[in-house]
Amino acid sequence: MGKKSVLWIAAGVILLGAAAWGPIVSNVEQPKYETVETADNIEIRDYAPMIVAETDVSGERRTAIGEGFRTIAGYIFGNNLSSLKVPMTAAVTQQASEKIAMTAPVTQQGDGETWHVRFVMPANYTTDTLPKPNNPAVKIKEIAAKRFAVIRFSGWAGDESLKRRTEELDAFIKSKNLKPLSAPTYAYYNPPWTLPFFRRNEIMIEIAR
């Protein structure tokens, strides 16, 4: 309960402008979930099991997000050991690198000093079929099915905004007599250059079923 987490939604951030971002995000694979309840800008969601690529990063939250993103993006874009076909070629080799489709979300959990940054892997992969990371800092993990209370908002997701929205979500959880099981997870769906009113941000707290 003492740990904080950040969820960074990553979806094709290379060479994309803010104007083009909306349609692209809608076509990016995201973890499967069912909406159990909706109350204005808050939802209760049941998420299916998922596989993530994770790396640990020390430091301030924003700095750690950037470093962790770059580390796992390297794995996504080919810094891995694969026995599968390399896209755009016909070769099959143990030393070939494989590009993995970008998905949403990427998660980051931490205690304020160390953050565990996670990319969600495409659903068509298993832990056996995913290429192995070349970088030992990247780990592949399975995440069990979970239920979350989620609040959605636009604008800049600065510390004060995150604090205020977290308090709003906490109040909702208490009003429903729900049992929180985790600290907040911050979800970002847009690249840094996206205009505030185009941004989609979420805060997620795991709750008991």
Where are these regions (language model features)?
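A solvent-exposed interaction/effector surface
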Residues: 2-209
